[in-house]
A protein has these predicted regions:
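Single-residue recognition of alpha-helix boundary sites
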Residues: 34, 108-109, 136, 199, ...
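Flexible, membrane-associating and regulatory peripheral segments of lipid-active enzymes
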Residues: 1-93, 107, 116, 295-299
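Short, function-defining helix-loop hinge/capping sites that tune catalysis or transport
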Residues: 31, 69, 105-106, 133, ...
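Serine-dependent carboxylesterase/thioesterase catalytic core
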Residues: 94-104, 110-225, 241
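Short, amphipathic alpha-helical "lid/cap" segments that border enzyme active or binding sites
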Residues: 63, 137-141, 269-277
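Helical cap/lid subdomain of alpha/beta-hydrolase-fold lipid enzymes
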Residues: 173-299
């Protein structure tokens, strides 16, 4: 028993150490990019957060990364799809994780939504590493078809984190009017790419998220997605994974910039949750615009 406790403690310490090392790498890379491209970053607003705020964002991001690493076993849980309740008109909400992540990322956000009355929430898995975003989009389509069919719903809403937003966009673009997606809310999605791993060549998914990649060019070409679904992009000026952070801006969508939050911290933020809840509950579509500081689009 004592040996198992020691192994568990070593595992926890290893996850915490790995989380800290990854974030040191990411934040140093983001700072290096700011130094190399100061005019663009200043124009994009990435230097508006004072250094104490960035230091706090780093500490919270380390904690969020470690917490999600420890939550990995919970990703094995599966929620059964249920028919819609006649007295609840809201569509099912599908939660889509990002690169190298898992469905358990949404445990906190899903619990808050359940507490506020959402009954049909489904965190789905897709290929987290070593795959292809468009192939993941096809698998997502099969999952959404099953959710709509079993729930008896004509549409679903999607809340996607990081790369999950690109998977959702690829799916909606491929299916067009038949996608059945009413609203797409993305959190920290690199809509215009990210330069966090400029020299990493082992995983093709990372290459697909580089600025100017063939995939991003296809998604951006006469992008029909904002016309097919209500699109809201929530991104942080202090995101060290989406580099520069302004690449979280999604042309054609309603964009909300927040500050003082890292990439994974977006999933635990009360400010971000309030935006997600309000935008899921709102009835009319947002106009393409940008709201600074976290103001939701008007009802």
């Amino acid at each position: 028993m004592a040996a198992l406790a020691h192994i568990a403690m070593l595992l926890v310490l290893g996850i915490v150490a790995a989380s800290a090392l990854f974030n040191v790498y990411a934040y140093r890379g983001a700072a290096r990019h700011r130094r190399r491209h100061p005019p663009a970053c200043a124009a994009d607003g990435e230097d508006r957060t004072p250094w104490p705020g960035r230091a706090w964002a780093f500490a919270v991001e380390c904690a969020a990364t470690a917490l999600l690493g420890l939550a990995t076993p919970l990703a094995l849980r599966r929620r059964r799809v249920r028919p819609l309740d006649p007295d609840d008109p809201r569509p099912p909400v599908v939660l889509l994780h990002g690169y190298a992540q898992h469905p358990a990322n949404f445990l906190w956000l899903a619990r808050r939504l359940e507490r506020d009355g959402w009954r049909h929430l489904y965190a789905v898995a897709h290929t987290p590493v070593g795959g292809d975003i468009e192939r993941s989009a096809r698998r997502l389509g099969e999952t959404l078809d099953r959710v709509r069919r079993t729930a008896g719903a004509s549409r679903v809403d999607i809340v996607a984190h990081s790369m999950g937003g690109l998977v959702a966009r690829a799916y909606i673009r491929a299916r067009g009017q038949a996608s059945g997606v009413g609203r797409l809310i993305t959190l920290g999605t690199p809509h215009q790419g990210t330069e966090i791993f400029p020299r990493f060549r082992l995983d093709p998914m990372v290459g697909q998220m580089r600025p100017g990649s063939p995939l991003l060019a296809r998604l951006a070409a006469d992008d029909p997605v904002p016309r097919l679904a209500d699109c809201i992009s929530i991104y942080s000026a202090d995101d060290a994974v989406v580099v520069p952070a302004s690449r979280g801006y999604y042309p054609g969508a309603f964009n909300v910039e927040v500050r003082g939050l890292g990439h994974l911290s977006l999933l635990f933020s009360r400010r971000v949750y309030a935006l997600v809840r309000e935008n899921l509950a709102a009835e009319r579509a947002p106009a393409p615009a940008t709201a600074a500081g976290g103001a939701p689009w008007p009802r």
